[in-house]
């Protein structure tokens, strides 16, 4: 086989391997995507997956939590402060919410920092997550009905 054909074959093999490696890395990235839920009703958080375990605190409805692991009837979740606790699965909903993590989040009419200000939400206010928006923005709705866009770094739960 001429040297140029051998070189071309080597390049093709390496490109193919690199492509497979990139696909595997992307699949791994997707597999590690965070899974968020919201608390559906006032619910106790426990230190172990049992109703007989020590109750740590009570979680309010709408609070976003990150699902870490699930066992039969129980889920280990992380809250916006980083606390890891166990909750009964029946208290978790698929509805997505976010919680404001800055002193005052500015909710705007569009996903643009120069857009009209719709309202401001203070730290720890829970907002319903409506949809992803332009890069770095998210559309949310306040429980009073007002909706708009805010920067993703101003909230936790995404």
PLM region descriptions:
Residues 7-8, 26, 31:
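A general, composition-driven signal for non-globular sequence regions
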Residues 1-12:
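N-terminal secretory signal peptides that target proteins for export/translocation
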Residues 14-28:
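Bacterial N-terminal signal peptides
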Residues 29-48, 55-61, 68-126, 130-146, ...:
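SH3-family beta-barrel domains
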């Amino acid at each position: 086989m001429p040297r140029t054909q051998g070189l071309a074959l080597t390049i093709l093999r390496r490109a193919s391997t690199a492509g497979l490696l990139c696909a595997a890395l992307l699949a791994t990235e997707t597999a590690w995507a965070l899974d968020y839920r919201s608390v559906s009703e006032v619910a106790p958080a426990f230190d172990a997956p049992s109703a007989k375990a020590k109750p740590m605190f009570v979680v309010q409805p709408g609070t976003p939590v990150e699902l870490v692991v699930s066992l039969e009837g129980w889920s280990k979740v992380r809250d916006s402060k980083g606390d890891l606790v166990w909750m009964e699965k029946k208290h978790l909903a698929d509805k997505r919410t976010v919680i404001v993590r800055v002193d005052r989040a500015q909710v705007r009419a569009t996903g643009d920092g120069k857009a009209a200000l719709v309202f401001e939400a203070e730290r720890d206010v829970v907002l319903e997550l409506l949809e992803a928006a332009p890069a770095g923005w998210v559309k949310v709705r306040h429980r009073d009905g007002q909706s708009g866009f805010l920067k993703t770094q101003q909230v936790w739960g995404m």
